[in-house]
Swiss-Prot record:
Catalyzes the condensation of iminoaspartate with dihydroxyacetone phosphate to form quinolinate. GO terms for biological process: 'de novo' NAD biosynthetic process from L-aspartate. This is Quinolinate synthase. It is an enzyme of class 2 (transferase). [4Fe-4S] cluster binds at C101, C187, C280. Pfam families: NadA.
Amino acid sequence: MFTTAFAQREQTQPGGLPLDLFAAIDSLKKELNAVILAHYYQEPDIQDIADFIGDSLQLARAAAKTNADVIVFAGVHFMAETAKILNPEKLVLLPDLNAGCSLADSCPPKEFAAFKAAHPDHLVVSYINCSAEIKAMSDIICTSSNAVKIVQQIPKEQPIIFAPDRNLGRYVMEQTGRDLVLWQGSCLVHETFSEKKIVQLKVAHPQAEAIAHPECESSVLRHASFIGSTAALLQYCQTSPSQEFIVATEPGIIHQMQKLAPNKHFIPAPPINNCACNECPFMRLNTLEKLYWAMKNRTPEITMSEDIRIAALRPMQRMLEMSN
């Protein structure tokens, strides 16, 4: 008699995919002693099957604490790199290696090295949305959850470079009163939101609160009643008495908002053009099918040189220490 697991493997679609992907992935998790970490911007099916869902800081903490042998990272490349930096002995898989990040790509290591050399007395605080090479050139890493807190802990006389996101950098400057030297990078998704259309939505929905991620441009942030990381936005929509929200961040988060506040209404902030530009094309590269094949074949694997990993680990550890 076939075992249940064997029978499930036999029930396949054309191309070899199991009929029940959820069950097959669950079986592979047990077989590999794997954990699935997913960002809030992933598609709903991936969020639902993940062992842990979070923002960049939460995911970094989860990666640092996991006892799993295999980390399957449903996110983008820099997030999976972060997991590898913290867990060199573990197998770290990314369902699609092409799942990059426009913000990380906006800060090429060679150009940033020259920028850093032009400011030799500056401390480098880098947003976690950057490559391992940029992390290795940094003194402290931060996330949108803790960027303000991190900068507030740095002595006021210490000049700071903030990279790579200029919009988050401006927000941190406003919140701390510090004068930061900003690298001029940005996220293509968070720069597509239309201020005009958000104002029109607020007129059409006068009871709705606009909430926004600090990667948005200041023209959008000025219309938000609350600004915060993805985790903070989720918390706010649960505790706010408002019943309707205009959400200025990647709309994948609305899946969790609806689960956590099912009686409330969430409106994705529209982009400038009539397109799906407010959806991150890189996050959308990951699918349940790719996640299955990554676990089945134990590839694509995240790798990096040990020199880069060790250099990138130090500012990551400083962040975790300073954000406790």
